[in-house]
Amino acid sequence: MNVAGEFTTATPIAGLRALGAKPDVLERVSTLRDVRTGAGGVVHAVFTPSISLGQIPLATTITTLEEDETGARLRVVGRRGTQLVDVDLRMDFKSTTDGLTVVNWNAGLIVRGNAASVGQRVARDITMRAIASVLAEAAQVAGSAVSDAHL
């Protein structure tokens, strides 16, 4: 399944690119907790998206596959028991003339386990909202961290 979205943020591209190396900043995202960086720069966290079914915490790993000034490609894997969400996430960054950053993202994802069969009718909407929400909030906290660093 594929989902995509776009948002605009005041956070500069450099601030977005630095997120993977700053678990203390990612920890400020409301749906992430226990954020740490492991071997090879892999980010480990518990991701708990708010969905209509309640909160479902997923033990999550985020691996940067590619990254440069124009964007990044990440592999995000979330697990809970026998449930698995495997996401290939591509983000493209573009600076605007008024100093903002436009983030276009698209994600190919696979859902495995009971959640795949039970939630297949709603999986697209749930995952699109969860990804859009965590990306936009991560960009916002990255912007706050950049502002705090300049104070």
Can you describe what each PLM-predicted range is?
Residues 33, 58-66, 87-95:
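Hydrophobic/aromatic beta-strand elements that line small-molecule binding cavities or substrate pockets
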Residues 135-151:
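Short, highly charged C-terminal tails/helix-capping segments
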Residues 37-80:
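Glycine-rich portal/gate segments that line the openings of hydrophobic small-molecule binding cavities
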Residues 1-44, 50:
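Hydrophobic ligand-binding cavity/cleft-lining segments
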Residues 22-23, 126-135:
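Short, well-ordered alpha-helical segments
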Residues 13, 37-40, 65-71, 92-102:
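A short, structured loop/turn motif at beta-sheet edges
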Residues 1-6, 42, 71, 86-88, ...:
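Intrinsic-disorder/low-complexity, polar/charged segments enriched in Ser/Thr/Lys/Arg/Asp/Glu/Gln
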Residues 77-128:
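Beta-strand/loop substructures that line and gate deep hydrophobic ligand-binding cavities in soluble
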